[in-house]
Amino acid sequence: RKKQEKLAKEQRKLSRCKKGSKNYFKQLRKVNKIHYAITNQRKDYLHKLTTYLANNYNVIAIETLNLKGMASKDGFKLGKSVHDVAFSYFTSLLEYKLNDRGGKLEKVDRFFPSSQTCNHCHNKFPITKDLSVRQWECPNCHTINDRDANAAKNIRDEAMRLLGITAPIKAVELEGNSGIVCR
């Protein structure tokens, strides 16, 4: 985000320059240099993350997301954050690195009710469609489920079902906001 702020500052300076002047082109080079640095920073992080995942896991399950809807103003109001993640680039990097190492990237359909299904008793509860509900208790088995962790477990289980895997899979554990702990 620091580079984004610097970019905004330099773009404001550029907008004040007279188009076609020597100072305009000097400022344009500065703006382009920051764009280039941001792109390289993002690519470097994604390459390091996907290499780590591909080296440590044979099967990775992800949910296909409606990124266009998430980025739209009427959607989830995550616009800049969704674009900063470069999810499509991430999945393509991860897929080719897993293929090179003999692994598999399994994509679970976005309409699969991952956050609405209890991972313990597999009953579906549409009340959890509301995104503000972060934890919920299953009325059937009385298990308290964290929305994200429960969804991650359901995506893992669905991917295992799609692949025909019955043996347990080592779960991905990432630090911070970059992932969900799924056991």
Predicted segments — roles?
Residues 1-91, 165-183:
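Substrate-contacting helices/loops that form the catalytic groove of nucleic-acid
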Residues 81-183:
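Positively charged, low-complexity nucleic-acid-binding target-recognition regions
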